[in-house]
Amino acid sequence: MLNTEKVKLGICPIGWTNDDMPDLGKENTFEQAVSEMALAGFKGTEVGNKYPKDVNVLKKALDLRNLQIASAWFSSFLTTKPYEETEKEFIAHRDFLHEMGAKVIVVSEQGHSIQGEMDTPICEGKYYFNEEEWKLLADGLNKLGRLAEDKGMKIVYHHHMGTGVQTTDEIDKLMSMTDESLVYLLFDTGHLVYSGENPIAILNKYANRIKHVHLKDIRADVLEKVKKEKMSFLMGVREGSFTVPGDGCIDFEPIFKILDENNYEGWILVEAEQDPAIANPFEYAMKARKYIKEKTGF
């Protein structure tokens, strides 16, 4: 299961050091993170804040470990700022990733987002775009998609807790309003389950537009606590709402099966942000790799 000729397996640095809460994993260096990724059996990673900004320095460090850059997160503000501001930042981001050999660019709209707010309840305080904002978002993403296409790349939209594109209805609306040849979807298991969505339904519906996959699991008891105690997204992360595949409540077997049946081609990355002082990053990377091998033979 899963075509090893077409699928690449990676892991994100957020398990070692958290860009949104830099105190989590502040003791973990870039070199330690990428060395442990390679040692655990992964072939790629996404870019974190501690990664060298110089392309040649980063390439050398990754080449030593036989790792590639799969992508990097880009925050758009298409609903709250002039398009030109986002475009300028996007082009610089695109060009860096292009030099690193990446084929996809992860984009998430952060206008009105509460994901980075420490005190806003993640399950209650979400913003809902109005029609004008939806149009700004869709039009802007189509433009960014063309800019990516200019370099032979694709943008993949990251639905995310606490943002204007979180629920099934919102994902449907975004997909219907954007050009299917310019705007693709990032499929994130953890964010869908966290939001109460059906990841299998999303995967089946958009199999042809999903060009990037994040695997994260959910600790159901912690998620229940987050809801009950009205915690923010970041507080939930500190509590351990997310973990690696095989360590939580999500059944990944049907997900792997559907990806395989639809001839998925691209990166599948473990992305499980939690406190590295509690969940040792190398240990959990090994745990994830073992689980994926057991379920897919990969």
From Swiss-Prot:
Top enzyme class: lyase
Record keywords: Cobalt, Lyase, Manganese
Annotated TM spans: none
GO biological process, one term: inositol catabolic process
Entry-linked Pfam families: AP_endonuc_2 (PF01261)
Cofactor(s) for this UniProt protein: glutathione; Co(2+); Mn(2+)
EC number in record: 4.2.1.44
GO molecular function: manganese ion binding; myo-inosose-2 dehydratase activity
Catalytic function, reaction form: scyllo-inosose = 3D-3,5/4-trihydroxycyclohexane-1,2-dione + H2O
Pathway: Polyol metabolism; myo-inositol degradation into acetyl-CoA; acetyl-CoA from myo-inositol: step 2/7
Top-level taxonomic group: Bacteria
HAMAP family assigned: IolE
Family: Belongs to the IolE/MocC family.
Protein known as: Inosose dehydratase
